[in-house]
UniProtKB/Swiss-Prot annotation:
Species assigned in the record: Neurospora crassa (strain ATCC 24698 / 74-OR23-1A / CBS 708.71 / DSM 1257 / FGSC 987)
Gene: arg-2
Reactions mediated catalytically: hydrogencarbonate + L-glutamine + 2 ATP + H2O = carbamoyl phosphate + L-glutamate + 2 ADP + phosphate + 2 H(+)
Region (Disordered): 26-50
EC number(s) stated in the UniProt entry for this protein: 6.3.5.5
GO MF assignments: ATP binding; carbamoyl-phosphate synthase (glutamine-hydrolyzing) activity; glutaminase activity
Protein name as it appears in the record: Carbamoyl phosphate synthase arginine-specific small chain
Length: 453
C-alpha cells in the first residue's frame, strides 16, 4: 500500500498564475454572526418524549433490532450510516452533512457529558454546535446515559432529541448493525416507536439520496459574518456550512458573505478576494446549478478557491471529473490522509458517502491527498492556479486539528491575490500611454476603449 502511494508522490510546487483584478466592497448588510442564517423552514416536529417506550430499528431487506426509545415520539426513515467517533456527538448531530441520515454510533455509551447550551463566541457563531438544529434524521446507540456531567451541559441527550423532534433508540447491538452496513453498504432504514411497520412495506422507507438535500440546508438569502478587523472579503457558497468553517475564516482576518448554494457566484466574484465552497449533504450530482456556476467562475476569474467535503466534489464536477458513491462512506475523527506534496500523514475528521474518481481528473489538476485506509481521493489542487480542495474536514469539530493549516494556506492565496490586484490597480497605464504604445506597436490609430469588444 505504502509503496504504491510513494510512487504517486509528486514534487511540491508553489501556486502561481494569480492574475490581477480590482477589488470592490460588496454592498451587503452586516448581520451578526450566523444568526443571519435564513435556513428553509422545517415541517413541525413532534416533541413529546418517548423515553422507555419500545422501539424498532429496521434495515430494509436486512435485520430488525428491538430496543428502547428515547428522544421524540415519532417515526422516521433515512439512510443508515455509522460513525466511529468517540466524542463530539453534539457537533456530529448538528452537522448539515448528516441531513436525511440515521446516525449509528459505534461508541458504546453516548450522552455521558450531556448537551451544551447554544452559547455564541466573539463572532456570534455557535460555540458547541455546527448549525442551529439537529440535522440527522435519528440516532442509534448501544447505551445512552440518562445522567450526565459536564460544566457546559444544560440538558440530557434524550431531552435534546425530544425538543428537536428527533427519534432515537438504545439497547440494540450496534456492532451487528455496523458489521451489516460494512458488508452490505449503507442501507435504507427506519426507527419506529411502538408497533413496527410491515417489514415489507416499501412506503416505510424514504431514500434521501433521491432528494436535493443541499436545497434543504442552504441559506435562502445572503448574509454576512463580520470581523471588525477584516483585511479580506470572502464569498462562501453555502451547501450546508458548519459553524467552525465560518469561524476558521473569520478568525483569520476575513469577513464572509454567505450565499445560497445556487447563487451565480461568477457574477459577483470581482467584489471578493476569495471564494469558498462549503461541506453539505447528499449526492453532489443534484447540485447542477452550483457545478455550472463554479465552471463559469473558473473560466472568468483567477480568484483563489477552496472547497471542503461536498465543496471538493462540486469543484471536481465543475472541472469535468466524476464522483462515485462509496460502499459505506468514511465517517470518523481518526482517518489518516497522506499529503502527496510533502509525504506527511495527517489524522483527519471525515464525513462523506461520495468521493472523487481521481482517474477522471483533468490534466491541469493533480491529486493532493489520499486516504491511507482505502486509497480513495482526499483532495486535489490546480497545478498553476490558487485552487485546491479537500474531502476531509480541516476545521474538525469534532476531531483533530492536524490539517487546520490549510485555512492559512488559503488565506495566503487570498492575500497574494488581493495584493496583486492592488498593484495592478495602482500601475494601470493611462489612456495616453495606451494610445502611445498602441501606435508604436502597430502604427495605426488604436480603437477607443469605449468601442472595443
Amino acid at each position: 500500500m505504502f509503496s504504491r502511494l510513494a510512487a504517486r508522490l509528486p514534487k511540491a510546487s508553489a501556486l502561481n498564475g494569480v492574475a490581477a483584478r480590482q477589488v470592490r466592497n460588496l454592498s451587503q448588510p452586516a448581520i451578526t454572526g450566523s444568526k443571519g442564517r435564513n435556513m428553509p423552514a422545517r415541517e413541525p416536529r413532534t416533541t413529546a418524549a418517548a423515553t422507555g417506550a419500545e422501539a424498532t430499528f429496521t434495515i430494509r431487506d436486512g435485520p430488525v433490532f428491538q430496543g428502547t426509545a428515547f428522544g421524540a415520539n415519532t417515526n422516521i426513515s433515512g439512510e443508515a450510516v455509522f460513525t466511529t467517533s468517540l466524542v463530539g456527538y453534539p457537533e456530529s448531530m448538528t452537522d448539515p452533512s448528516y441531513r436525511g441520515q440515521i446516525l449509528v454510533f459505534t461508541q458504546p455509551l453516548i450522552g455521558n457529558y450531556g448537551v451544551p447550551s447554544n452559547e455564541r463566541d466573539e463572532f456570534n457563531l455557535l460555540k458547541y454546535f455546527e448549525s442551529p438544529h439537529i440535522q440527522c434524521a435519528g440516532i442509534v446507540v448501544s447505551d445512552v446515559a440518562t445522567q450526565y456531567s459536564h460544566w457546559t451541559a444544560v440538558q440530557s441527550l434524550g431531552e435534546w432529541c425530544a425538543s428537536e423532534g428527533i427519534p432515537a433508540i438504545s439497547g440494540v447491538d450496534t456492532r451487528a448493525i455496523v458489521t451489516y452496513l460494512r458488508e452490505q453498504g449503507s442501507s435504507l432504514a427506519r426507527i419506529s416507536i411502538g408497533d413496527e411497520y410491515d417489514a415489507d412495506e416499501d412506503e416505510g422507507f424514504i431514500d434521501p439520496g433521491q432528494i436535493n438535500l443541499v436545497k434543504r440546508v442552504s441559506t435562502k438569502a445572503p448574509f454576512v459574518v463580520t470581523n471588525p478587523n477584516a483585511k479580506f472579503h470572502v464569498a462562501l457558497i453555502d451547501c450546508g456550512v458548519k459553524e467552525n468553517i465560518l469561524r476558521s475564516l473569520v478568525s483569520r482576518g476575513a469577513s464572509v458573505t454567505v450565499f445560497p448554494y445556487n447563487y451565480p457566484i461568477h457574477k459577483v466574484a470581482e467584489n471578493f478576494d476569495g471564494v469558498f465552497i462549503s461541506n453539505g449533504p447528499g449526492d453532489p450530482t443534484h447540485c447542477q446549478e452550483t457545478v455550472y456556476n463554479l465552471a463559469k467562475l473558473m473560466e472568468t476569474s483567477p480568484i483563489p478557491i477552496m472547497g471542503i467535503c461536498l465543496g471538493h466534489q462540486l469543484l471536481a464536477l465543475a472541472v469535468g471529473a466524476k464522483t462515485i458513491k462509496l460502499k459505506y462512506g468514511n465517517r470518523a475523527h481518526n482517518i489518516p490522509a497522506l499529503d502527496l506534496t510533502t509525504g506527511q500523514c495527517h489524522i483527519t475528521s471525515q464525513n462523506h458517502g461520495y468521493a472523487v474518481d481521481i482517474s477522471t481528473l483533468p490534466s491541469d489538476f493533480k491529486e493532493y491527498f489520499v486516504n491511507l485506509n482505502d486509497g480513495s481521493n482526499e483532495g486535489m489542487m490546480h497545478k498553476t492556479r490558487p485552487i485546491f480542495s479537500t474531502q476531509f474536514h480541516p476545521e474538525a469539530k469534532g476531531g483533530p486539528m492536524d490539517s487546520s493549516y490549510l485555512f492559512d494556506k488559503y488565506m495566503e492565496n487570498v492575500e497574494l491575490f488581493k495584493s496583486n490586484s492592488q498593484v495592478y490597480r495602482d500601475n494601470r497605464p493611462t489612456q495616453f500611454m495606451i494610445d502611445i504604445l498602441s501606435k508604436e506597436r502597430v502604427g495605426v490609430e488604436p480603437t477607443p476603449l469605449s468601442n472595443a469588444a
